[in-house]
Amino acid sequence: MEYSYPLNPDWTTEEMTIVVQFLEAIERAYEKGIDTQELKDKYRAFKHVVPAKGEEKRIGIDFEKASGYSAYKVMQLVKNATTSKIKMQP
């Protein structure tokens, strides 16, 4: 798929990398499946860059519009996960 990630130009290169890694993990949750702990770790790092709920929500909405993948739905599944790996159903 060809789309761009919702990034803030004020972020450092390292911060952009962290956000992209989290969004790539969301993609993997839909496409191949992902280890629950790995996704939790990526989310924790993402929250250090994007601590505000409002900005997190905006990034999630922009990403879903561009990709069709919902970060919110993935993280809800992770929060309630009882398995070590999750895969979203399309």
From Swiss-Prot:
Family annotation (Pfam families): UPF0223
Source species, domain of life: Bacteria
Gene3D superfamilies: BH2638-like
NCBIfam families (UniProt xref): PRK04387.1
Family: Belongs to the UPF0223 family.
Name of the protein in question: UPF0223 protein LMHCC_1569
